[in-house]
Amino acid sequence: SGKTTAIVNRIVNMVNYGDAYTNPNVPENTTEEAVELMQQAYDSGEGAEKVRDIITNSRINPWNILAITFTNKAANELKSRLLDVLGEEGKEVWASTFHSMCARILRMHADRLGYSNHFVVYDDEDSKKLIKECEKNLKLDDKLLSYKSIRYEISRAKDNLMDCAEYRQRTYGDYRAAAIAQIYELYQKKLFDSDAMDFDDLLVYTYMLFRDHPEICRKYAEQFRYVLGDEYQDTNFAQHSIVLQLTQEHQRVCVVGDDAQSIYSFRGANIDNILKFTQLYKGAKLFKLEQNYRSTQ
């Protein structure tokens, strides 16, 4: 049904027309000629550019808009479409994946967390080598614990903002879980000592940065006065928590998603993020996207 189209159109209307669509007042000093021009544009569906300056009310600066999505492919499509419609102004919208946004923020503030702002981001192969090293250091039998199972458990813990201590408390005497807890703790220590983060840490440390340094969170909340999220059914607890941190004061947030398309639960996606959205944001309005933008039929 074109969820990305809905996000793009929303941003374009905010930048071009501000709150003209919700403002009940006719613009001041509107001439009869202008009213006639607006009526013609309305009747014909053409001439939007001619009436833009007449009906615009409190345009939104593109640099005050944050648009976040789930995959690099979706983020690139979003950027491309905004550039096509808005031109150079489209470049000023912060459009990126959650991880790219977090990396960008941490590059400026990681020193508040004990890292340097030039920290290294480990890829999957780097993480695999480090986890294997931790197993060896702890003299654990790698035949009993596969790399995939260890990586999965650590990643899910981070998706849920569960640190090493909390994870250890939840092992309940289970040998396998206790062994993973040991690896998790040593893995994080070695990452920190190497001034490195893995992909999941980008979310965790951004959340921690905003939690422990509210003045930084406030800075970005004031910059991103309008937050939009695409494919929201695919977000995990950590991603959703960061959105809450940025929007809890101004409450200007718009997300699109389809609860029937949630396919990433194995990666930590939490469908409740969209199902319970109206409970978290009182007064939120729900719109059903029933127009198919992909088909010519």
Mark where each language-model region is.
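Active-site catalytic microenvironments for nucleophilic, acid-base chemistry
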Residues: 13-21, 81-85, 108-109, 134-137, ...
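Switch/connector loops and helix/strand junctions flanking conserved nucleotide-binding motifs
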Residues: 74-79, 102-105, 162-163, 262-265, ...
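Coupling/switch/interface segments within P-loop NTPase motor domains and analogous charged loops
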Residues: 124-191
